[in-house]
Every structure is written in C-alpha cells, then in structure tokens.
UniProtKB/Swiss-Prot annotation:
Comp. bias intervals (Polar residues): 49-64
Induction note: Expressed in the late phase of the viral replicative cycle.
Signal peptide span: none
Name of the protein: Inner membrane protein H108R
Segments crossing the lipid bilayer: 10-32
Any one Gene Ontology cellular component term annotated for this protein: virion membrane
Alphabetical keyword list: Glycoprotein, Late protein, Membrane, Transmembrane, Transmembrane helix, Virion
Protein family per UniProt: Belongs to the asfivirus H108R family.
Thylakoid listed as a keyword: no
Main location: virion
Length: 108
C-alpha cells in the first residue's frame, strides 16, 4: 500500500504556492516541507538500522577497520604544544616584556 500523505501534502503545498504571492509565506512552507523530508528520511533510516531481518555481513576487514577507527570528535594537539609554549613566553598572553627585546645596533 502506498502512503498517500506525502502526495496529499505536495498537492496542498503546490496549491498554496500558486494562490499565495507573498515570499515569506512561500519560504515558510518550503522550510516546513524540507524539515518534514529531513525528519522523515532520518526516521526511515533509523527504522532500517533497527530492522532485525537485515543483518549486516561481517568480515575480518570491517571488524578490524571499525576497531582501528578513532572518533572524529577529539583531535589531539600535542604537536602544537612546543609552539604554544614559545608563544606563551614571547607574546602578550604570556609574560611578554617589551624592554627585554634585544635592541638592534644603529636603530634609533
């Protein structure tokens, strides 16, 4: 059975777009429709993931790949530590003293 709700919604939206000439109303309707499509798509993807009948095939490559994969939420910045220490001792956010800078010969 085909779900007729999206078709009905599309017909109503097209009718409103034809009869309405205001841009703000049109943009509101378009944003509501896109939100509905995004939410509906995410919901169906989640349903598909929760489906017990379609078990994903596992092999050693995918298991080792998923085991070796690191999360993208935390990026280590240890390589930046020496530069930050140098900048901290050199610039205003550290203990910068303009009078401790070497004076060039011949500079007035």
């Amino acid at each position: 059975m085909v779900n007729l709700f999206p078709v009905f919604t599309l017909i109503v939206i097209i009718t409103i777009l034809i009869t309405t000439r205001e841009l703000s109303t049109t943009m509101l309707i378009v944003s509501l429709v896109t939100d509905y499509i995004i939410i509906n798509t995410q919901y169906t993807e989640q349903q598909h993931e929760n489906n017990t009948f379609s078990m994903p095939q596992k092999n050693s490559f995918s298991e080792s790949y998923n085991k070796d994969k690191k999360s993208n939420t935390h990026i280590p910045y240890q390589w930046l530590a020496p530069e930050l220490k140098e900048a901290e001792s050199k610039y205003w956010w550290g203990n910068y003293d303009p009078h401790s800078e070497p004076v060039l010969a011949g500079a007035s």
